[in-house]
Swiss-Prot record:
This is Elongation factor P 2. SUPFAM superfamilies: Nucleic acid-binding proteins, Translation proteins SH3-like domain. Involved in peptide bond synthesis. Stimulates efficient translation and peptide-bond synthesis on native or reconstituted 70S ribosomes in vitro. Probably functions indirectly by altering the affinity of the ribosome for aminoacyl-tRNA, thus increasing their reactivity as acceptors for peptidyl transferase. Belongs to the elongation factor P family. HAMAP family: EF_P. GO terms for molecular function: translation elongation factor activity. Transmembrane segments: none annotated. It comes from Chlamydia trachomatis serovar D (strain ATCC VR-885 / DSM 19411 / UW-3/Cx). It holds the Pfam family EFP_N. Pathway: Protein biosynthesis; polypeptide chain elongation.
Length: 190
């Protein structure tokens, strides 16, 4: 495995700490007036999702984690899970529902997802940052709603995601949604 020095730490770098894969979320280089310089990093565990802070003396090195990403298309979902396919090799991968809990509301057939693999095993599935989804259910906008200060209303998309949309959005319309926050971005014109 490749080792990286503290001078090579950067946000997004995948490292192995205590045998577990982590991604660096924040890296602060600290040079105190007295004593040795050090790096204080905030890292997120890929397996548990827990965020911790670690400190490394300047010049120390740690192993990089064997974490890689693979782009795959969602073919279909069934009672077992979701089946993804690599567009280049046509290799198919079944991911069980227990690994899809965080993205279940964003699963849409024929969409490209990022599968995060650690030592060859899928540890998470990441949806695209922005998705175009159809509004399946929402209350009609009532005239005068904006006068009372109410400009958003709840809506359910065709994937089952519950989001807040502006009152002018109606059922059947396509909207752009940020999957990181679950928020409405814009109306999509066809």
């Amino acid at each position: 495995m490749v080792r990286v020095s503290t001078s090579e730490f950067r946000v997004g770098l995948r490292v192995k700490i205590d045998g577990q894969p982590y991604v660096i979320l924040q890296n602060d280089f600290v040079k105190p007036g007295k004593g040795q310089a050090f790096n204080r990093i905030k890292v997120k565990n890929f397996l548990t999702g827990r965020v911790i802070e670690k400190t490394f003396k300047s010049g120390e090195s740690i192993e990089t984690a064997d974490v890689r990403e693979q782009q795959m298309r969602l073919l279909y979902t069934d009672q077992e899970g979701a089946t993804f396919m690599d567009d280049e090799t046509f290799e198919q991968e079944l991911i069980f529902w227990d690994k899809l809990e965080n993205v279940r509301q964003w699963l849409l057939e024929d969409t490209i997802y990022t599968l995060v693999l650690y030592n060859g095993d899928v540890i998470s599935v990441e949806p695209p940052i922005f998705m175009e989804l159809t509004i399946a259910e929402t209350a009609p906008g009532v005239r005068g709603d904006t006068a009372s200060g109410r400009v958003l209303k709840p809506a359910t998309t065709n994937t089952g995601a519950k989001i807040m949309v502006p009152i002018f959005i109606e059922e059947g319309e396509v909207v752009k949604v940020d999957t990181r926050t679950g928020s409405y971005e814009s109306r999509v014109s066809k």
